[in-house]
């Protein structure tokens, strides 16, 4: 499996160093865990509070910034055979929210970012925790298993 990663860092912080190789490892671990084997493309944009707030309001009608937004690609079926790699979609991750949540939850910023990346990739693959309690449990279970493979503790344990 080949992963093409587009990383746009509109907001950076010395508290959270993002390395492409590590991001690809997290994405690949997530994809393999759920049985995905195709070459793919994923975009990640790291943004500030203002941009996250604006996008969350525009696309989810929530008037506040959020940690991660997922935008699955909507490629017509007839186009797929012409592509070398399947565009899975884009993730927008708000670095200030990640840092604040990590502090509040007593986690490292790196581990919290990894959790949100796993969470976002699962959304790009069609998983949704907002449709039912069962779906939420399934998604959380997958996140816990994937993060364990990355040597990251269960993010839902206090």
From Swiss-Prot:
Transmembrane segments: none annotated. Gene3D superfamilies: Metalloproteases ('zincins'), catalytic domain. One of its GO terms (biological process) is rRNA processing. GO terms for cellular component: cytoplasm. Zn(2+) binds at residues 119, 123, 129. One of its GO terms (molecular function) is RNA endonuclease activity. The keyword Zinc applies. SUPFAM superfamilies: Metalloproteases ('zincins'), catalytic domain. Keywords: Cytoplasm, Endonuclease, Hydrolase, Metal-binding, Nuclease, Ribosome biogenesis, rRNA processing, Zinc. It is found in: Cytoplasm. Binds 1 zinc ion. Its EC number is 3.1.-.-. It is an enzyme of class 3 (hydrolase). Pfam families: YbeY (PF02130). Its cofactor is Zn(2+). Belongs to the endoribonuclease YbeY family. Single strand-specific metallo-endoribonuclease involved in late-stage 70S ribosome quality control and in maturation of the 3' terminus of the 16S rRNA. NCBIfam families: rRNA maturation RNase YbeY. This is Endoribonuclease YbeY.
């Amino acid at each position: 499996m080949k992963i093409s990663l587009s990383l746009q860092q509109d907001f950076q912080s010395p508290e959270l160093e993002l390395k492409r190789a590590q991001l690809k490892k997290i994405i690949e671990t997530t994809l393999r865990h759920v049985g995905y084997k195709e070459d793919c493309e994923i975009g990640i944009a790291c943004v500030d509070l203002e941009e996250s707030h604006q996008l969350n309001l525009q696309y989810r009608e929530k008037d506040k910034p959020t940690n991660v937004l997922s935008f699955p690609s909507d490629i017509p079926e007839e186009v797929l055979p012409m592509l070398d790699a399947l565009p899975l979609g884009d993730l927008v991750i708000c670095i200030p929210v990640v840092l604040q949540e990590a502090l509040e939850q007593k986690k490292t910023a790196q581990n919290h970012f990894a959790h949100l990346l796993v969470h976002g990739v699962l959304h790009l693959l069609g998983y949704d925790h907002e449709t039912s309690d069962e779906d939420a449990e399934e998604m959380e279970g997958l996140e816990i298993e994937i993060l364990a493979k990355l040597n990251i503790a269960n993010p839902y344990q206090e």
